[in-house]
């Protein structure tokens, strides 16, 4: 194995903002630490695996040839101060590629395909925080799987996806090293929406969308032990007229489980509101449905005059005893539990298309406008408009709701962009775009600090950002009230850093916040 050679710049606590035109910056966001990894080749790709208070594992895919074939992958373990704990190199076959990664109770897992032409041959590498040694687990699923989920719970790895277009869930115990298919999933009627792991009870919940006999759709939630033994199977009854499009679930705690998602009467692409469900020991207690028009701030991301016009239409409809209907595509996040409340997050988006003959052909209200263009449609990506945050109590009554405008983000696959965190009664919403941490602080239905734009801080006083890769940047939760931003940047410094006036780096900035501070 060839010794790894790279330049690692560990940045001190004092970091400096980039030069940019004046915009409102947040008074509550702090960026105390930063680390940079210099990119020697454009082909390098970085993956970050947050491990709570154990730090972050940074994985770099390179095109550097290994001593006995294959390519080098560089790994760096950093602690919560973004100081390097260890660095290492491993060689992967040239046909192998990374599928997913996971962290659970001090262990970091990387899931790879050994051969891109044989999806049933997998390999998992397990790393610990304190040393670069790793364990290897070779897994053969017998049949090819299109993997969509990779999780870990206790001594068990969870692999889920589709085999022959049907859902399948596999458990793999790292002690006996035997893969087992979890029964009850290989059915054409179901689609896997998500998998939720409870670290404390070491249970996992699989959320499925299921087609009913009346051709409507509902949600089924199955909870298992880490061995794959089922302990609860909940099927939501949405009534005769509604379809449930998606769902997020709380962890299974003492027989109590909540579900939240979106619903519609006809379309499977557009939702008309939210639903909240409560289960106790497998018995559905109730469903509560809320139209978008019933929320206080759902349209708060719009310009004031437009919001006022929409609210007037809602009130006119309400005066006649009816509810105004709105259609949105929403990407639902996981449910957060804090201080006796349950917080649901969703991001509104719409697909954008271009036409070879007539150009753009899309609707800013959330969808493609048919019949207005010519030629073959060319998919440009998903455009995000705003995030919705709502809190509900144990009886599924909505306590408050807020919105957060999203600008400039477009992705080719649906991705969660907005991160929600908080302390006390205050909640902060953040996303990273164009090298800015865009944020908003709310306290229930009140806005504490409006939208702000805090530049990602650079390492040296004379640093100047030249370009950044829009496809490689984001914010992730880390531990407690700490997050981190990451991305790729081209930086210029006339004074020079390590003998260079320009450098291309992959960076991680530690982000903390003080919500007790008064806004600017």
Describe the residue ranges of each PLM region.
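Beta-propeller blade signature
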Residues: 72-80, 122-130, 171-174, 217-230, ...
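Bacterial Sec-dependent N-terminal signal peptides
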Residues: 1-26, 520
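Short beta-strand elements that form the blades of beta-propeller/WD-repeat-like
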Residues: 47-48, 53-68, 104-117, 148-149, ...
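Loop/turn-rich, solvent-exposed surfaces of beta-rich toroidal or solenoidal domains
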Residues: 331-358, 369-391, 412-449
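Conserved blade-ending motifs and adjacent loop-strand segments that build the rim/top face
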Residues: 234-246, 289-326, 400-419, 448-480
């Amino acid at each position: 194995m060839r010794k790894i050679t790279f330049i690692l710049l560990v940045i001190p606590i004092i970091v400096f903002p980039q030069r940019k035109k004046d915009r409102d910056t947040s008074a509550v966001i702090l960026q105390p630490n930063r680390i940079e990894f210099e990119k020697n080749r454009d082909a390098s790709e970085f993956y970050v695996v947050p491990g709570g208070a154990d730090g972050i594992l940074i994985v770099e895919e390179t095109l550097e040839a290994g001593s006995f074939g294959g390519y080098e992958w560089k790994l760096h373990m950093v602690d919560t101060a973004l100081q390097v704990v260890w660095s290492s190199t491993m060689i992967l076959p040239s046909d192998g590629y990374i599928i997913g990664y996971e962290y659970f109770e001090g262990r970091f897992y990387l899931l790879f395909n050994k051969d891109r032409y044989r999806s049933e041959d997998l390999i998992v590498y397990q790393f610990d925080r304190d040393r670069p040694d790793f364990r290897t687990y070779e897994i053969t699923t017998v049949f090819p799987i299109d993997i969509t989920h990779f999780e870990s719970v206790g001594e068990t790895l969870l692999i889920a996806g589709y085999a022959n277009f049907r859902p399948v869930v596999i458990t793999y115990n790292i002690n006996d090293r035997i893969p087992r298919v979890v029964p009850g999933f290989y059915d054409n009627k179901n689609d896997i929406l998500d998998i939720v792991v409870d670290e404390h009870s070491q249970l996992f919940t699989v959320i499925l969308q299921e087609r009913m006999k009346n051709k409507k759709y509902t949600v089924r939630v199955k909870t298992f032990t880490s061995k794959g033994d089922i302990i609860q199977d909940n099927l939501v009854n949405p009534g005769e007229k509604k379809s449930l499009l998606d769902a997020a679930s709380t962890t299974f705690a003492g027989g109590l489980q909540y579900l939240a998602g979106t619903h519609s009467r006809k379309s499977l692409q557009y939702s008309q509101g939210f639903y909240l469900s409560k289960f106790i020991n497998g018995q559905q207690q109730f469903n509560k449905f809320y139209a978008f028009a019933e929320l206080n701030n759902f349209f708060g991301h719009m310009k004031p005059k437009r919001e006022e016009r929409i609210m007037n239409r809602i009130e006119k409809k309400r005066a006649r005893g009816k509810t105004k209907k709105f259609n949105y595509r929403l990407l639902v996040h996981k449910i957060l539990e804090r201080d006796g409340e349950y917080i649901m997050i969703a991001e509104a988006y719409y697909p954008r298309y271009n036409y070879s003959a007539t150009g753009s052909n899309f609707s800013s209200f959330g969808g493609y406008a048919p019949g207005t263009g010519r030629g073959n449609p060319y998919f440009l990506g998903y455009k995000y408009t705003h995030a919705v945050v709502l809190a509900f109590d144990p009886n599924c009554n909505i306590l408050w709701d807020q919105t957060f405008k999203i600008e400039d983000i477009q992705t080719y696959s649906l991705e969660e962009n907005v991160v929600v965190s908080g302390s006390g009664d205050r909640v902060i919403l953040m996303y990273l775009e164009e090298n800015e941490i865009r944020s908003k602080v709310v306290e229930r239905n009140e806005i504490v600090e409006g939208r702000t734009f805090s530049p990602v801080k650079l390492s040296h006083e004379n640093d100047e950002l030249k370009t950044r890769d829009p496809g490689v940047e984001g914010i992730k939760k880390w531990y407690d009230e700490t997050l981190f931003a990451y991305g790729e940047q081209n930086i210029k410094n006339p004074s020079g850093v390590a003998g260079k006036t320009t450098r291309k780096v992959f960076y991680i900035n530690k982000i903390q916040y003080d919500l007790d501070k008064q806004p600017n």
